[in-house]
């Protein structure tokens, strides 16, 4: 989609606030009659022909810089006051009502502000209207001031307008999976959003639920235990959760959908606060190693890393790559990611030509990562030599070896060798990270021979290796595990699942040396990342995935014992990972993975595993394994437009007392959550009568914990 830079409007007003000049600022050569700015001009101000000015107000300016720019734009040498009818600019009242210098009141405290334009003017990327008045024409002339224009701003703007026609602003924006915001979105706003979804008739599945103090929610044919008393959920057409809100926190996976839904309705919420990361794909490559040739601190701040920029307020970080840009924003600002992408593309056109791909190891651009740098006692960085020693044995077309040294020759004919003065790091190998990402063979010096490594085989012998080589190093539990890594289980589950199993580690590190079988944590289950934020998400995932899930010190089972699959998942930082058995021989780096011993956890499941009918009528049968119609399990998704609320559903004392012995087998401190999750579903499914609750439970759930669990 091609990004269109929105026009801007500057209105100079006189003593009666009548419009003396209306400047339509645009980098294009025409008026966009479909733009909100032109509609505002024509419909609200009755101005049909404004002055078209080929200029652009940078949204990254501070108020003082903006004031100097506007004085220059309008050629005003007097003190001025700037304001807007939509947002407060340099002045605001303590209660945040809109400031107007012509209707000033002393009953409210007035605050002066010198923040950045895109921060104080919500929606400035799409609709910016600034009113300018001479201070002497207002009721508060003492509040006016004059600011000199920053010539660097004018110089940059001039260059921007010159390169603008050649800019390729064809971009595609996607938001980072599962962004979480803070806001004050309450019941009224949530209801308006759900109504908007239904009015649009876009076939998105939506659900608005309200919970009692025990968090019981009933909708369609499934029951959800949730830690939120109020929840809005909307799913994309492919069934992916697009956004979810509990009234205080908004989880947004599809930012475009969210902004479209709330763009023209009053949801009675303040500006959303929280982190969000955008990935912007570019149609035309840029140079990621950006260099600014003039002073541009009013736009970006350069960092020590040449492909990372910061916004002037240091709250937005921009990471550049050849074909995409990643932008991390502290607070949600509509379309700021597109605007900053526009500025980056423009700066590339001004100061940076796109470089052709070059070998990492050309002499003029020698680069090694931090893991291959020399330190006090380690000399890991290879050196460049000009010739081969006589008598060196040719191992391949690009690798030679003798008793004293090894030499690698890259594609540019540059020779690398390792000559550690301490006589330790003299074996040439290659950095896995660059080879895995880009197939770059970056030499590094190692303690031991590297010829058995897969990366060595690829770089020296051109033998293809698997793309997803797993490192034999086992990480401590707690961090998200990538495809090429694995980690230990939490201590309690490591001891339980690996009882009787051993893993031999190399001395002084966590590198796996050999094992005939050991439970570890592998990367995310399946091809897609699955993130579970709430207890409701966890329960829904377990029942749909039909496998065991470990969350902190709790084990979640599917509601139906017969559904329990042969996988074990574990949640790390809200991301679903897999528990697997790893096997490795000491003589090889090859790592093999096998399914876990799921029966160790499955045998802890306390529910009756034999399907028993509870109630039947007219071909419909409710059993301990689900609801059947004419012998077929009923699992259809019912309409989410109709919501049923339950009030004051509680777990009775008799139920809690009956199952209390079971808790000694439950690895959890959250026993109340455990019994509510389980028992409430039992009561609802069985329509339990309080008068005969004990006999009913004994009939269908005899293993209450009084008998030993095997």
UniProtKB/Swiss-Prot annotation:
GO terms for molecular function: DNA binding. The keyword Manganese does not apply. The keyword Ion transport does not apply. GO terms for cellular component: virion component. Pfam families: Pox_VERT_large. InterPro entries: Poxvirus_early-TF_lsu. Its main location: virion. GO terms for biological process: positive regulation of DNA-templated transcription. Transmembrane segments: none annotated. It is found in: Virion. Keywords: Activator, DNA-binding, Late protein, Transcription, Transcription regulation, Virion. Acts with RNA polymerase to initiate transcription from early gene promoters. Is recruited by the RPO-associated protein of 94 kDa RAP94/OPG109 to form the early transcription complex, which also contains the core RNA polymerase. ETF heterodimer binds to early gene promoters. Heterodimer of a 70 kDa and a 82 kDa subunit. Part of the early transcription complex composed of ETF, RAP94/OPG109, and the DNA-directed RNA polymerase. Belongs to the poxviridae VETF large subunit family. This is Early transcription factor 82 kDa subunit. It comes from Vaccinia virus (strain Tian Tan). The lineage of its organism: Viruses, Varidnaviria, Bamfordvirae, Nucleocytoviricota, Pokkesviricetes.
